[in-house]
Amino acid sequence: MPTSQTMEDLRADLARNIKQFRKLRGVSQERLALEAEVDRTVVSKIERCVGNPSLDTLVKLANRLDTTVSALMAPPLAEPA
């Protein structure tokens, strides 16, 4: 049975994943924004769980980070018990 997520959960997952993908690729917020053709404040807001990025923005960020929008929105894997 699927678990339901709140908007806050989704924003937190997105923030964590974008930051993680960005850091794994050694890219600053500014560089990511420049190469994805979005404003740097957009990346900052996403990583701070502020605002509501458009699908267009998510696609641009996912493309630059060599991943998918689904991966950016994915909840964390459950910790083994």
Where are these regions (language model features)?
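A detector for short, charged/polar N-terminal pre-domain segments
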Residues: M1-D13
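Short, charged recognition helix plus adjacent turn
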Residues: P2-T3, M73-A81
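Short basic helix-loop element that most often maps to the first helix and adjoining turn
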Residues: R16-E35
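Conserved hydrophobic/aromatic packing and binding residues within compact polymer-binding modules
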Residues: I18, L32-A33, V43-I46, L72
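Helix-turn-helix DNA-binding elements, focusing on the entry/boundary residues of the two helices
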Residues: I18, Q29, R40, L55-L58
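Recognition helix of helix-turn-helix/homeodomain-like DNA-binding domains
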Residues: E37-G51
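DNA major-groove recognition helix of helix-turn-helix/homeodomain DNA-binding modules
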Residues: D56-A71
